[in-house]
Amino acid sequence: MADQMKCNIIVLSLLCISFCACDKDENNNSNNFATGIVELPALRNGANDVFVTHYTTFNGQKVTSFSMEYDKSKKHSRWIAFRFDNQTKQQNVSRSDEPFDADPAIGSQYQRVQADFGKQGYDRGHLCASADRLYSREVNEQTFYYTNMSPQRNKFNTGIWLTLEGQVQSWGRSCTSSDTLYVVKGGTIDKEDQIRGYISNDLSKPIPKYYYMALLFKKGDSFKAIAFWMEHSDTPKSTKLVDYALSIDELEEKTGIDFFPNLNDNLENALEATYSTKAWPGLE
């Protein structure tokens, strides 16, 4: 597989691009390679779709916890997006084990409840993992909102998916003051052939058949990108994360979601077309 992949680490000084826009993000406004918040995919903006961003105050600053596009008709997030940087990578608290609760930003009638999980044979699987947000108690508690939950089989949730989450956290926590890892996670809820089933045969409660991640790493003035696509199964096809890797373009084809659309077009096109597993420590 690796022989067929091209390296996509791109150094800005080698790109014949004039960067004139700036990243409009309160967490990091010193970048000039994007026209908006980098981690956000393009919104579908359907009649039942709601865009939500949760924030916390950390060290006296307003910090983005995570963002989501939530489909009220399916009681499930289409995706969750967040970042690891010099602030948000910090591990100042442990898992809160706060009671799972309704997201105050969305009407509770549009959210799932405990009975939709355990009694149906599914874990309340975090999309933005508890271990992704450990820089404050408040942000960790936000990860327990039901809008951040997805019905996952226990062997998947505590198996290959957990392994991938741990690897991504390792990459994210390697960030220095000039680095950022942008992360998008989700489960498939839009295409019928990508739905595993429905909780209690209720069409408003789909169970994703696949889960994915899209990653963009800015390290100094260089960039790299990679994606992962996993079938939601009790038995993984492989225990090696490298076997689930693909390009961002390939993930977009599968999901119908446009990832990292706020990047400068030339940079986006180059990064998303290819990937290199060798560029990601611990993957091979």
Protein language model annotation of sequence segments:
Residues 1-32:
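Bacterial Sec-dependent N-terminal signal peptides
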Residues 22-284:
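Domain-level detector for secreted/extracellular nuclease and nuclease-toxin modules, and
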